């Protein structure tokens, strides 16, 4: 039997193909995909490839996914066929240098899972054991598929040491920038978001921003001045989170922070990118700079709880739902910066609009 799947062959070369439906081996689970959601990382990967995710091609594409267990291999415990589940896109090894120190996102043997843009997805044993979760009744598959980006945003906020009353600036109003703003607001921060794109900025207040700055016609110097005008005595922000991923906005983030502030370089730049920083402001201003990557099983579970408890409306970021067969059209729109985030629904779930149909 075959399934429809999007396969990554290289930059700007993703193909929709009929592929064999995989069979689960020992400890593995086969998910019938109910919803997969697009991600900025997938858009970047579509455009230029990815140094970590695709060592061999062709390979399955997409990593934000939820669905129903269709089959299980030997020795799987805690799950049953028909369970509605969400699978994380990774699991740490638990024994390397970084895992022994609790830095699971830096695992030297981190196992990644791709292939969400398909009718079926085979979940490896390690992820089944560490990072596969049943859905609560009433949790939509689309919302559940967005657990992964919310977990990444939780990682970013966790590393930012935010206290109630802090001024937090988020540079970038994409899906992750908006999720970062929402979580910062839950921590009691005064949130300023600066970005481009009317559609994205129109959602910023809904996702917790107290101040929304349209940077479309502004120079970086003007952005810095406007941001500082919203901080105490124009000192700068307590925390600045860069969620764009360009060397210019990395440098801008450092200039927006107050002395003693924290700069979180959340947005990833292309490999080999160099950034120019004013070392005087970093050194004499005693800035703390952090780079943030990925998530951990604990953060993934916390993100799912936020979604289940309706504390963050992740589904509000979805511009539209499309059948899985429209995957390439959806990425064409994203490459042209049309829309924020899309849900891709396999044919078996199109009529249900990705609502759970089978729960224990």
Where are these regions (language model features)?
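Residues located in well-ordered beta-strands
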Residues: 4, 20, 32, 66-68, ...
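C-terminal hydrophobic helical "lid"/dimerization subdomain
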Residues: 1-5, 228, 251-255, 296-360
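Glycine-rich cofactor phosphate-binding loops and adjacent beta1-alpha1 units
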Residues: 160, 167, 207-287, 328, ...
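Glycine-rich beta-strand-centered segment in the early N-terminal region that forms part
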Residues: 22-36, 50-97, 134-136
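NAD(P)H dinucleotide-binding glycine-rich loop of Rossmann-like/cofactor-binding domains
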Residues: 93-171
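Residues in the short beta-alpha loop(s) of Rossmann-like NAD(P)-binding domains
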Residues: 197, 269, 295
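Mid-domain Rossmann-like dinucleotide-binding core that forms the NAD(H)/NADP(H) cofactor-binding site
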Residues: 139-218
